[in-house]
């Protein structure tokens, strides 16, 4: 016998002792053993442990009984399945015992065992088998009405089982339903309540037929509002409807037209508890079935408005109320103390249910926001005076919900011609602000902490939606903030909330609004800085930092004299900084606050400046505070006050140098930023020995291992080169070696390249230059020029562009050398002995040098570039076209007419010449292009009918770039082309519009927005190519600048959805030898339409009717391979973004996924077909996994059946598990770049 088994055996022996203390201690020790993962029981030990624990459930000592029942939980996972079933059988038998205590223990035991059973999703069948075993016994226990205690315990356990394992118990659902329905008529309220809960869980998991039976039963049992019926019976049925609505509301949609009018009638009966249940049912219906509730919204809104003010036992005299608001705060507090209170008054529950229902109404119907602002908002504001704390919190919550839905979407763009709906909503909200202030003015000083917290939350949300709207009411807000900051009799939470609100306010309101109130506001903030509770102090330091940053900004003249305040702020902050026993958060906030104080007001610190800097230096030496200290030092160094930092530089620089060796990325990044700021601000004041110490650490940081670190290192090198070039002598060689190696990386980010260009220019810009121009050019070009043979360019294409940019940067820094460089490049480009790589680099360098130093030898250059367009190397041809355009942009009078003439004269080279024109149009200044607009416009539109799609695409891009030259003149001309042009011309014009859209704000946006509706009419064009181009343009707008199209979606979406449908007239059969091949000409258009739908999910979710949207997603799940892949990804996103509508139709959505996952590949399929099918399965299973993250989805019988099918199929199980691991290990890769 092992040591563990022997120990268990000795415990079991003590558990049978006659001494209850022995039994208790032994059972406690067994509990500890069972909780260990390492414990292993043999079969004999299992049997003995189970038998002994079950016997102890009947122990005379209640303490021993309670401990024994707790042991059952960990025991379940340590014994075999038949032992668990033995435990369950015994507990079920004990449930029917005559002894009340034993029945109670058995009930607790069953709940404990059920809670510890492994979920069905893990593949274990234990939970299902155990539940099936006890369901029948629970049913009979519920049906026997002799003992109510047994009934209640059985109903509790049944509810727990159904909530966890509803669907797998499908065979029992009918018997459970028929057992539970009669209990709705039980004379015992507790039985009825537990039955309502159980039926709610059953409704979520049962079959459609049983659900219909349940719904019909509830509807049929509800009497007419005037028919005689027991109020208790009606309340129970309405509560049951509410429970079903909360648990399975997505299945109630089809029954709502019958249910809602009846519930409305009952809501008007004089029974507050019934009214509460009716309103709770409406809330569930609105949240789960917003589409089906649409016809009933006006009536529900009316009921909410009526019952939100339902307070029959209290007289709210509005005239008195207004008069009271003018009284002083002492009278206000007296009135607050005399609040009405009546324990028998239930009307507050009705008001709370109405407020919650109103919040559900707002969140489920954002499309009705204008109506809500007219009807709900004033009513909510009037009810801010609510006397019941819980109700008031829900009223605040409903108004906050309205604010959140009014918040403009990201990237919102107001139209110039007419305000959008978003703008009108904001205007309506702006008109409400004075009313909100008036309603909450007294409440900001309410005795009740929760009320004040609600006010702060509401104002924070309001300031976020309408920045600047609270400025004229600052006196009221400051008064309320100060009141809470000085409230030491309540929890410190209210001070933290007040501070957080003040910090947010400083970020949204203009600084001038705070100036008159600073003498009042600053003392309580200073007191909070010194607060002994670390969270209050940390929050206060953050506020102080924001005060300094906002009231004395560095980019504008000071409008407020800091002299009266700077001493007090400095003293309070330094006191916190000097303390050594502080919480880490307070230390970091104090350091940051000092950084802002010195950076913004250092010139007013006088003699306190040097001690403050020394304190910062001291924190720099401390490992715990060094990162915030580095950031604070950066703030100080970057300050335009140009403070004298000499007292700390000699010691600080070596410390900073040591940080560059630390294996802490955040510290290295912050240190490099600090060093660069110091070098820029202090320049020659930096001690050269200390600078050299820092520089020796830099070569190791210029590496592609971390591009961001490399960029900051190069930026610092540039600054040092400009301020102390002599310090660079020793490290310039190693640094250049690393930098040139970095330039050979094909993944070089634009920021690193720009930093490198700046550094190279700094090297040759010093007098004398740190490194000679010719030497740097040789170093840059050596890897290309020294390449042996001509096996192609050798290096990655991107590397050539990087090297060319650096050559151009050097030429710009040394204008006297540029002409010679250009001549050498032309010679290299035309030399027959030059390799492909040399020619590519020469042309790309000429393109860049031409931009900064002129085009060099004109006639010869044109000839060389034209000849290169006929090169056998594709890389050389592309580089020459690029160079022709870029060089031409620098000398339009000479090059552009020449380029246009060549396009006319050389149709065979048209594609390359159009690429050159595109580069010229993109690189030239718009004003310089104006004289050539008409010629270029005419030439481009002559080529819109090219049969080559690639050519038409380049033409479209050229047209787009040309429009930027004079948008008001050229953009309207698109109308004529769209109306009169041929199909190819129309598609080219629409494609050109796509190139007018960027993800950054642009001056053309308002003008473009006014034309979008006309462009989108092309979705009705008879030509497929035009419709596809329109969808591509629309997708680009939705992805990059959704504000352009948001307000047009009502008109666009029906046309978009039309394009997702399969058109049989576009499907044809093509004979290929003995085989027939099906071609779907509409596939590309459908695919473009589904890509638009995906983009809409990311940026315009609030404008979509999700039920209609899902109809088309459902169709896409059965479409072509490419479209199914798109819709699987969409469905995975929808499962997260819109769980409620997805849940409503999950039974229909899961079938196409099941069909894909279980599809068999045809015999003899080629490898490509096998791979496509495998990827399709994987994508479908990802969608399944995303759906299953919603616990409500798992309750669906169809989903439960498919889950069981996955678990029973080893191949599907492996696939599902691998997807779950991928999801757990990192973010999903199922994102699409559709721009």
Curated annotation (Swiss-Prot):
> What are its GO cellular component terms?
cytosol; nucleus
- Identify the stretch(es) annotated as Disordered: 314-345
Q: Name one GO molecular function term.
A: TBP-class protein binding
The UniProt entry annotates HEAT repeats at 2-39, 44-81, 83-119, 129-167, 171-208, 210-246, 254-291, 326-367, 371-408, 431-468, 516-553, 564-603, 607-644, 647-684, 689-726, 730-769, 771-812, 856-893, 895-930, 932-965, 966-1002, 1006-1043, 1047-1083, 1104-1140, 1156-1193, 1203-1235
Modifications after synthesis and translation: Ubiquitinated and targeted for proteasomal degradation.
What cystine linkages occur within this chain?
Answer: none
Q: Where is the composition biased (Acidic residues)?
A: 317-345
Q: How does it assemble?
A: Binds TBP, CNOT3 and UBE3C.
Q: Which family does it belong to?
A: Belongs to the CAND family.
The protein depicted here goes by the name: Cullin-associated NEDD8-dissociated protein 2
Q: Which organism is it from?
A: Mus musculus (Mouse)
This protein's gene is called Cand2
